[in-house]
Amino acid sequence: MAEEKSKSSAMDAFVKLEKVGEGTYGKVYRAMEKSTGKIVALKKTRLHEDEEGVPPTTLREVSLLRMLSRDPHVVRLLDVKQGQNKEGKTVLYLVFEYMDTDLKKYIRSFKQTGESIAPMNVKSLMYQLCKGVAFCHGHGVLHRDLKPHNLLMDRKTMMLKIADLGLARAYTLPIKKYTHEILTLWYRAPEVLLGATHYSPAVDMWSVACIFAELVTQKALFPGDSELQQLLHIFRLLGTPNEEIWPGVSTLVDWHEYPQWTAQPISSAVPGLDEKGLNLLSEMLHYEPSRRISAKKAMEHPYFDELDKSGL
């Protein structure tokens, strides 16, 4: 009975202030810890009807987050609380540090005023993103769902942190087959769109490239509304790939004969980005995944030379 009491009172430590979102696996609240007055984000995980105990997806997420939380550019998991809902089912609350905005809202605020994000701020955010991604990859974890919405930010300090590792999966070499129902379409790498079942860290770097371009222009680089349209957006800018450009492309499950486009200069899609930035962007947008720049290498790119990296 004491056990029951501790479960239901696990959440008495917090006051829920407002619902701030809906993650892959459950609701997210802004809450206050009663004992300290500290503001936190509570992620309540939804357990399926037929599940006894905690779903393996959640356990995986918790163990990954505990490991990755050491990096300043990954959102910090402060605690895990177990409680019970009204029906008496077990509910898990993940307690995260609270960040006041995300990159999607940040970009939208500039779009609304018609202003551009200062080039040095783009550079700082991109460096932090590459640093966080390099940390995840260095620990054998692919995020697989990087997009502005799950990059949290502190507007005052311009600190960026990667969140929603709900779909992240530790990859061990040789890289296993993955389900390809992942990633918001706009940030989805071409190998995923074409049905590749072996992914590498390069899928995240494609997403990073799309986020980079969006920071500069406040517009999605490839805003497709279906998998086919998404591919055609990519082909129109980068040219339709072939075996010469991307060996093995025609053997991918969803490869068909596509309209033939020739590559356009990337600068046409990202006006306002300087030469070093365009070079880095093109290094991230290679069709062949093995040629795409890694996050670690990207951090050493001349584009970041003028950036003051102390404190990042």
Curated annotation (Swiss-Prot):
This is Cell division control protein 2 homolog D. Plays a key role in the control of the eukaryotic cell cycle. GO terms for cellular component: cyclin-dependent protein kinase holoenzyme complex; cytoplasm; nucleus. The modification Phosphothreonine is found at T24, T179. Residues 14-304 form the Protein kinase domain. Belongs to the protein kinase superfamily. CMGC Ser/Thr protein kinase family. CDC2/CDKX subfamily. One of its GO terms (biological process) is cell division. The modification Phosphotyrosine is found at Y25.
